[in-house]
UniProtKB/Swiss-Prot annotation:
InterPro entries: dUTPase (IPR008181), dUTPase-like (IPR029054), dUTPase-like_sf (IPR036157), dUTPase_trimeric (IPR033704)
Organism: Syntrophomonas wolfei subsp. wolfei (strain DSM 2245B / Goettingen)
Keyword Ubl conjugation: no
The encoding gene: dut
Necessary cofactors: Mg(2+)
Name of protein: Deoxyuridine 5'-triphosphate nucleotidohydrolase
Amino acid sequence: MKVLFNRLHSHDLPLPRYMTPGSSGLDLYAAVDEEILIPSGKIVLVPTGLALAIPEGYEAQIRPRSGLALKYGITLLNTPGTIDADYRGEIKVIVINLGDKDYILKRGERIAQMVFSRVEKAEFMEVKSLDETLRGAGGFGHTGI
């Protein structure tokens, strides 16, 4: 799949890339102009400097990087974030610091990963009743904790 892109203010940064042959996600880089302090418990919007033209029938999902989450408590607030095929603006990442220490984010740091996925369009059909299942209406915690 080919994805067209514009570098908005990230000409000095690597393009998103798969870090291993088996990777599902491409790493995204922080295109901040200067270091950003992310205090513990705070949220920041991090630019990537990229705009994409995702092929119709696909989306990009923006996900956290597990190493940042484990080591520093740095994760994404809305995960996965969805980039629709018809969006042409800059990809930005909503980052939250859940760690107990402040975190300094530097330009060029790998901040998130992007996974492309096919999109199926749903067609809703109203019915009088739904078929029965073993689970039924069992919701949160219905199988135990």
